[in-house]
Amino acid sequence: MKLLLASQSPRRKELLQCLGFPFEVVSIHCDESYPSQLPICEVAAYLSLKKANSYTHLRSGEILLTADTIVSCSGQILGKPRDKQEAAQMLKKLSGNTHEVYTGITLKTSTKTTTLTDKAEVEFMPISSEEIDFYINEFKPLDKAGSYGIQDWIGMAKINKISGSYYTIMGLPTHLIYKELNKLTK
């Protein structure tokens, strides 16, 4: 079986490499809208499946892996920020609070589709305006849901507690992928 990763995320590429499965990166183009009435806990899985279904080149003997990560704080989804100002607003919202991170994955073959979601909770200590400005200017988190990467400075300095998989927060629930890929490749 040939594994195809449909993601441009350097973090997802790195994590999948660490699992030891050889893979090839493929591009997909998919509108990332979702129904507004969809429960927050289902959005990441919905988008992951939507991405998988938008890939039309899947052949027999191939496994397509897609993923989507969302951050939810106080019932509001925090996606990727449009600019530095929106990133600062998101980080202020996360400061001193606990939020949820949902990562949905889809593994698709020519005959089977499996979609799973993993949830983690993250508790931030208070983050000052100066720390927010430093983080945004030095680490450029505009490509990350919720405007932060747990593996960055802000994760090391300002996260008080996590519940769930660290790798789910990074954007790829490696434990689920390992289990499912082993099922598909045996």
Describe every region a protein language model picked out.
Residues K2-F21:
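N-terminal beta1-alpha1 ligand-phosphate binding loop
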Residues K2-L4, P39-K186:
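Anionic-ligand binding patches
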Residues Q8, I28, S110:
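Cofactor-binding loop segments of dinucleotide-utilizing enzymes, especially the Rossmann-like FAD-
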Residues R11, D31-S33, T113:
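Surface-exposed, flexible loop/turn segments at secondary-structure boundaries
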Residues E14-C18, P35-S36, H57-L58:
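Short loop/helix-cap segments at secondary-structure boundaries that form the rim of catalytic
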Residues Q17-L19, S33, N97-T98, G171:
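Short acidic/polar alpha-helix capping motifs at helix-coil junctions
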Residues P22-E24, M125:
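Compositionally biased, low-structure terminal segments
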Residues E24-Y34:
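A short beta-strand-loop structural module common to alpha/beta enzyme folds
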